């Protein structure tokens, strides 16, 4: 399980150090792709297979299902950790997520998310204000 928030930097070649707490669970190779809210999602190879199977059940007769699958899968790339614990984030994904030098990497249960630090900060500030209301509306269990 992935959890926590970590600040890292992109170098001039588009490489970013993956938080050491995430490296063991991600293994040497994992998948990154376009996520929601202008961030990147990162999945283990095993979790990616689960998601792929779920996506296969989407009705191809629905235009939105086709659009979503195209965006999600066309942005997907397998990355590999180098000896320094870095991954190379392709230019198209850096552009999609508006990644600048300063990044925030967060753990969200079964995935990691890679955010531009400023975008994450804005999203967090906006979401923090309504956190309790969201919990009340969406979550149907006690902690």
Swiss-Prot record:
One matching Pfam family: MraZ
Q: Which InterPro entries match?
A: MraZ (IPR003444), MraZ_C (IPR035644), MraZ_dom (IPR020603), MraZ_N (IPR035642), MraZ_sf (IPR038619), SpoVT-AbrB_dom (IPR007159), SpoVT-AbrB_sf (IPR037914)
Q: SUPFAM superfamilies of this UniProt entry?
A: AbrB/MazE/MraZ-like (SSF89447)
CDD domains per the UniProt record, alphabetical: MraZ_C, MraZ_N
Q: Which domain of life is it from?
A: Bacteria
Q: What range(s) does the SpoVT-AbrB domain occupy?
A: 5-47, 76-119
Asked if the record carries the keyword Transcription regulation, the reply is yes
Gene3D superfamilies reported for this sequence: Transcriptional regulator MraZ domain
**Alphabetically ordered keywords of this record:** Cytoplasm, DNA-binding, Repeat, Transcription, Transcription regulation
Q: Does the keyword Nucleotidyltransferase apply?
A: no
The record's Gene Ontology cellular component field reads: cytoplasm; nucleoid
According to the record's subunit comment, the protein's assembly and interactions are: Forms oligomers.
Q: What is this protein called?
A: Transcriptional regulator MraZ
Gene behind this chain? mraZ
